[in-house]
Amino acid sequence: MSEPQSWSVMASQMTSAQLIRVYLDGSMGIGKTSMLNEIPTHSLMGVPVLKVFEPMKYWRYYFTDLVTTVNDTCDRRRRGEFSLFQSSMIVTALQSKFADPYLVFHERLSSKCHRITGTRGNPSLILILDRHPISATVCFPIARHLTGDCSLEMLISMIIRLPQEPPGCNLVIVDLHDEKEHVSRLSSRNRTGEKTDLLMLRALNAVYSCLVDTIMYANHICPYSKDEWESEWLDLPWFDTSLATTFINEPRTDYRGSRVSLHHTLLAIFKRRELCAEDGSLSTTHAWILWGLLMKLRNINVERFNITGLSTTKCVESFMDTMSERLVTHSSWNDAFEIEADVLAYNKEMAM
């Protein structure tokens, strides 16, 4: 393999920087961080790879230990020491703090991501991030709601925080179908204050699987088919306790139809009488919120990555081998150098 090109050489060959940014996401303890640690600093073509790690230092040592406190709060709610209202207020406050580092970095990065150049481009920089802001603003809050630790009203407040997505977002949802292996990985981390909560694990896996379908639906329906979405909404059943149990516990299969239906999306969870008129139609404000969620998701290029039976090394090889199929965006060289500086500063202060 030829020696990796330096940034100065690459910059002299291109009028603008070409950026691939990829978010690795999925349930907790699935192996994302291990993958990220093993990803090389340059691709096989010599393209520099920048890695943004999970902000664990911020979560655990800046003010409150969020990991310990959120698990303790949920345990106390289940023991009857907290009411749903009390646990919801605490969990939502903690979940907002989980989201803060993602949102701050996302805002800085968004201003540097310009128009899409397509796929199979010649990138000058690959940026790989451990989780997208959607994890802390949508996926974990929905899972906490499904497990009974967060109320519907607080969940609504969280999903509003999902930021607008600039062009060129590649979101890879890591999947591990072997629950026994997943539990083993989570338990073996042995992190202080972290507990192996099988109900939460199943809820998260279901939410992330459903997220892929939701993004596919958004890509099809937005922004031109709002009437079609509203018609489908009326046909959804009320999401009650039995449907919540089914959602969490029944195995989900990858949707293979020509078009995802609203029934297969996360929005079906919000078909509640508290949010709707008697005929099932959403109140205006909540309709704006859910349609806004779809509009934010529609710029995301999503893919499932099934790592069942694969070693970390094989996962990394497979992930990097498909890099040329992901979206590329234009960025200025000044922006590219700023991204590098931001990543170094963020990892130094936030990561462990």
Curated annotation (Swiss-Prot):
It catalyses: thymidine + ATP = dTMP + ADP + H(+). GO terms for biological process: DNA biosynthetic process; TMP biosynthetic process. Pfam families: Herpes_TK. InterPro entries: Herpes_TK, P-loop_NTPase. The active site is at E54 (proton acceptor). Keywords: ATP-binding, DNA synthesis, Early protein, Kinase, Nucleotide-binding, Transferase. ATP binds at G26, S27, M28, G29, I30, G31, K32, T33, R185. Substrate binds at Q95, R191. It is an enzyme of class 2 (transferase). One of its GO terms (molecular function) is thymidine kinase activity. Its EC number is 2.7.1.21. Catalyzes the transfer of the gamma-phospho group of ATP to thymidine to generate dTMP in the salvage pathway of pyrimidine synthesis. The dTMP serves as a substrate for DNA polymerase during viral DNA replication. Allows the virus to be reactivated and to grow in non-proliferative cells lacking a high concentration of phosphorylated nucleic acid precursors. Belongs to the herpesviridae thymidine kinase family. Homodimer. This is Thymidine kinase.
